[in-house]
Design a protein with these regions (language model features):
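Histidine- and acidic-residue-rich, metal-dependent catalytic cores
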Residues: 13-200
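Heptad-repeat alpha-helical coiled-coil signal-transmission segments
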Residues: 1-3, 7
Length: 200
């Protein structure tokens, strides 16, 4: 049991190391990994307390999605610096390149964790990396999943990701106040997100 705990601790540290490496390449992200991980934790715990998807959002699920959240942008390793670190808005072509980070992220997770015996963790890590840009109305990427087709873990990750993007400063935009960011997300319920309002 002690050996298993040591392995899990080492795995967690390795994951955070990889996540921080990605973040260090992208000056736009700032504390994105840490922020989104905290938001995912808050959302997952609140959803569990509210009895949302009780058959899915268990105590184990909350722990797994918290630990998987830092890997959601791991696929950005595959994106060239000239695009990833661009301080201005991306062109249509550049955005198409950015979009591949979701599928690349899923592939990387399966490769990195192929020797891991924790299949539930691999599944959730794969989901948050691959599907956190899917939208409830089917207009997201990479697969254009609709509604309930989108894994719950990815839906939670999506809200955390968008909330952090809205409240962070960019060269081309000022941060939205938290209240306004929540209002924007709530207004998009049923279109970009599932019809349950964010639980901050």
């Amino acid at each position: 049991a002690l050996q298993h705990k040591k392995i899990k601790t080492m795995q967690s540290k390795t994951i955070m190391g990889i996540a921080n490496l990605i973040e260090s390449r992208d000056s736009n992200t700032g504390t994105h990994v840490k922020n989104t991980s905290n938001y995912v934790s808050t959302l997952a715990k609140a959803a569990k307390s509210a009895g949302i998807y009780p058959e899915i959002i268990t105590e184990e699920f909350v722990n797994l999605v918290e630990n998987a959240a830092p890997l959601h942008d791991i696929g950005k390793i595959a994106i060239p610096d000239c695009i990833l670190c661009k301080p201005d808005k991306l062109t249509t072509e550049e955005f198409e390149q950015i979009k591949i980070h979701s599928t690349e992220g899923g592939k990387m997770i399966l490769k990195i964790l192929e020797d891991t015996t924790d299949e539930k963790y691999i599944k959730i890590a794969y989901e948050v990396a691959t599907y956190h840009h899917e939208k409830w109305d089917g207009t997201g990427y990479p697969e254009g999943l609709v509604g309930e087709e989108i894994p719950v873990s990815a839906r939670i990750m999506a809200i955390a990701d968008v909330y952090d993007a809205l409240t962070m400063e960019r060269v081309y935009k000022k941060p939205f106040p938290k209240k306004k960011a929540l209002e924007i997300i709530s207004n998009d319920a049923g279109k970009l997100f599932y019809s349950v309002p964010p639980l901050f």
